[in-house]
């Protein structure tokens, strides 16, 4: 027998559906993701902390879940506060599957709802903007309780989540990407890169390792002096959740590294925004953000278009860029900034996710550019 569930939006909209995860309640900012696949990677992406993720593709869970496809680093954890889908298939099938999506959600205590009109929900979020919401799952639940909890959630503006989503102890990383029939590879490592962990995705670390980087991953609040004492060949700024402007410790550390050294610096997602803020620019909250694996982005220098993975609710405000920041990429959906490069330092960043997971690999050459900067600096 199915368990009822309710999704309430702060504007008063109510959706009634079926629970497919843990019973209880959860709140967060409701966003929509247009990726057709990769639901496990999305759920375990730390960038989704404090968010209720709506997947617009109607059938979610076809291929089940496994231990390998997690993006939450050494600790297998679901970071999304909740999941919202249209339909959960009765059967799951894949040679790598270890359990169903419903079993996975219950195991990780994730409150989730299915059997609602996700097209209607997506239109609301697109037109009105991302808004706070609540999922209630269980018997004897009420719309009034769900709505009250949705309106009580504080939102993401001004919220520093990077220090909460990083590994507090730091760690070393040497593992490369997964290959069919081989599993995860062990590449030859030629460079030492310190990676700031603001909520880093596992596949980012693997793609850096694929290119010869031995990674020392440090917590978000690590001072610049400690990073420089490690004598790295380059510094990486990871993705992560929350409001970048609230991460004053990260902004200060990156500013010190960029302004006082010539170390190559590469930032992704939140790391992109941190580099911009450290260089004197400002960021802004977006209407409904970019979440998906089919976002077109133009490379302004080459005039080419890339299909990218995106996951962010804040953006760099191009009108505030200082003279030493050059715009390199721009979204073809809404014209927002997607990439910058310092003109006076070997530092650059990209708003989207070149590591994909899930999504296309059109932007993978950005990792190669980072290696080129490291090679040039070592000469």
Curated annotation (Swiss-Prot):
> A Gene Ontology biological process annotation?
'de novo' UMP biosynthetic process
Domain named Glutamine amidotransferase type-1 is located at: 192-379
* Binding annotation for L-glutamine: 47, 240, 242, 270, 273, 311, 313-314
Q: Which reaction does it catalyse?
A: hydrogencarbonate + L-glutamine + 2 ATP + H2O = carbamoyl phosphate + L-glutamate + 2 ADP + phosphate + 2 H(+)
Any one GO MF term held by the record is: ATP binding
Q: Which Pfam families match?
A: CPSase_sm_chain (PF00988), GATase (PF00117)
Q: What class of enzyme is it?
A: ligase
Q: Which InterPro entries match?
A: Anth_synth/Amidotransfase, CarbamoylP_synth_ssu, CarbamoylP_synth_ssu_N, CarbP_synth_ssu_N_sf, Class_I_gatase-like, CPSase_GATase1, GATASE
Q: What does this protein do?
A: Small subunit of the glutamine-dependent carbamoyl phosphate synthetase (CPSase). CPSase catalyzes the formation of carbamoyl phosphate from the ammonia moiety of glutamine, carbonate, and phosphate donated by ATP, constituting the first step of 2 biosynthetic pathways, one leading to arginine and/or urea and the other to pyrimidine nucleotides. The small subunit (glutamine amidotransferase) binds and cleaves glutamine to supply the large subunit with the substrate ammonia.
Q: What is this protein called?
A: Carbamoyl phosphate synthase small chain
- What organism does this protein naturally occur in? Acinetobacter baylyi (strain ATCC 33305 / BD413 / ADP1)
């Amino acid at each position: 027998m199915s368990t009822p569930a309710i999704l309430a939006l702060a504007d008063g909209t109510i959706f009634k559906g079926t629970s497919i995860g843990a019973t209880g309640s959860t709140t967060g900012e409701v966003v929509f993701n247009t990726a057709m696949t990769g639901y496990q990677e999305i759920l375990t992406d730390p960038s989704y902390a404090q968010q209720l993720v709506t997947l617009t593709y109607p059938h979610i869970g076809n291929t089940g879940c496994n231990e390998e496809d997690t993006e939450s680093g050494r600790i297998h954890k679901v970071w999304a506060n909740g999941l919202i889908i249209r339909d959960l298939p009765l059967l799951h099938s894949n040679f790598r599957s270890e359990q169903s999506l419903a079993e996975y959600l219950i195991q990780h205590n994730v409150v989730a709802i299915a059997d609602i009109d996700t097209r209607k929900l997506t239109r609301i979020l697109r037109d009105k903007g991302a808004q706070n919401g609540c999922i209630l799952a269980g018997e004897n639940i009420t719309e009034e309780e769900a709505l009250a909890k949705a309106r009580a959630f504080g939102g993401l503006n001004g919220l520093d989540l990077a220090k909460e989503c990083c590994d507090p102890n730091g760690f070393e990383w040497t593992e490369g990407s997964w290959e069919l029939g081989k599993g995860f590879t062990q590449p030859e490592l030629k460079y030492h890169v310190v990676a700031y962990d603001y909520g880093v995705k596992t596949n980012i670390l693997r793609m850096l390792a694929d290119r010869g980087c031995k990674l020392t991953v440090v917590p978000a609040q690590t001072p610049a002096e400690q990073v420089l004492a490690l004598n790295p060949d380059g510094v990486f700024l990871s993705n992560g959740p929350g409001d970048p402007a609230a991460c004053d410790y990260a902004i200060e550390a990156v500013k010190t590294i960029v302004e006082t050294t010539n170390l190559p610096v590469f930032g992704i997602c939140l790391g992109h925004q941190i580099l911009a803020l450290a260089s004197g620019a400002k960021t802004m909250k977006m209407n409904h953000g970019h979440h998906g694996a089919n976002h077109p982005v133009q490379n302004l220098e080459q005039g080419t278009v890339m299909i990218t993975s995106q996951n962010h609710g804040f953006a760099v405000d191009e009108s505030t860029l200082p003279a030493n920041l050059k715009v390199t990429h721009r979204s073809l959906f809404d014209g927002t900034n997607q990439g910058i490069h310092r003109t006076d330092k070997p530092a650059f960043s990209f708003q989207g996710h070149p590591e994909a997971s899930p999504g296309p690999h059109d932007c993978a050459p950005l990792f190669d550019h980072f290696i080129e900067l490291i090679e040039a600096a070592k000469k």
